Amino acid sequence: MAHKKAGGSTRNGRDSNAQRLGVKRFGGESVLAGNIIVRQRGTKFHAGTNVGCGKDHTLFALTDGKVQFEVKGPKNRKFISIVAE
């Protein structure tokens, strides 16, 4: 009788969904109040003027205007601000 012993089971075969992080509105783009600018883990980008920071470090616009990226301070941190159009 042609039989084959059953193969063992594996503990692999899972993968998590992508988190969809990153910059959603780039420099010079127009935004409305409440628009998400960056989704991030930790503060890769810091909130500048007219930008709020959510509990998961998501940066969002507090007013309407244009997105502006800038590097400031002694530690060369990246700040995102909203400037009036």
Swiss-Prot record:
It comes from the Bacteria. The keyword Heme does not apply. Keywords: Ribonucleoprotein, Ribosomal protein. It holds the Pfam family Ribosomal_L27. Residues 1-21 are annotated as: Disordered. Residues 9-19 have a biased composition (Polar residues). GO terms for molecular function: structural constituent of ribosome. GO terms for cellular component: cytosolic large ribosomal subunit. One of its GO terms (biological process) is translation. InterPro entries: Ribosomal_bL27, Ribosomal_bL27_CS. PANTHER family: LARGE RIBOSOMAL SUBUNIT PROTEIN BL27M, RIBOSOMAL PROTEIN L27. Belongs to the bacterial ribosomal protein bL27 family. NCBIfam families: L27. This is Large ribosomal subunit protein bL27. It comes from Pectobacterium atrosepticum (strain SCRI 1043 / ATCC BAA-672).
